[in-house]
Regions:
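Membrane-inserting effector segments that mediate pore formation, membrane fusion
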Residues: 94-142
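Hydrophobic stripe of amphipathic alpha-helices that form coiled-coil interfaces
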Residues: 34-37, 41, 69, 76, ...
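Amphipathic, well-ordered alpha-helical segments in soluble domains
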Residues: 23, 65, 84-87, 108-111, ...
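Intrinsic-disorder-driven secretion/translocation and chaperone-binding regions of pathogen effectors
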Residues: 2-6, 139-140, 144
Length: 144
């Protein structure tokens, strides 16, 4: 499992996505403040419904764009998986099938937690972070 180091392109995409997410957070906080605290001398709320709706839509779009950049960065990380890619796809498919059939909520929580850990490891592009989540998910899938 030799993954290449994270590229500067991948890091740049993640940094931009982080910035867009932070901007969306700031927009949300400012919008909520405007809704709760009207301008001096104005009646509540301090923003019209149309303006609030437009700003909420902008917040959602910022988050969608950030998520798209995170996805692009993860795609770059996944491209370097080489031969592991098929093993990861197979294991993810097995996990998906188990998710469909699981009866116990605690097993569902544990399985999805392992799957999320593996997804995070893949997105990180760090080979040392991939082995443990892969093995844990594989063991969990086999135990169900």
């Amino acid at each position: 499992m030799n993954l290449p180091p994270r590229s500067s392109t991948q890091l740049d995409l993640e940094a931009l996505a982080d910035s867009l997410s932070a901007s969306a957070d700031a927009l949300h906080a400012r919008l909520m403040r405007a809704i709760r605290q009207p301008a001096p001398g104005a009646n509540p709320p301090g923003i019209s419904q149309a303006a609030a709706q437009a700003l909420f839509e902008n917040e959602v779009i910022l988050r969608q764009r950030a998520n798209g950049l995170y996805l692009e960065a993860a795609t770059l990380a996944a491209a370097g998986l080489g031969g592991m890619q098929q093993q990861l796809l197979d294991l993810a498919a097995q996990a998906q099938e188990k998710i469909r059939k699981i009866d116990k909520i605690k097993d569902l929580i544990a399985l999805t937690g392992e799957l999320l850990s593996l997804a995070a490891a893949v997105a990180s592009g760090a080979p040392e972070k991939l082995v443990a989540p892969y093995e844990k998910l594989k063991a969990r899938v086999e135990s169900l």
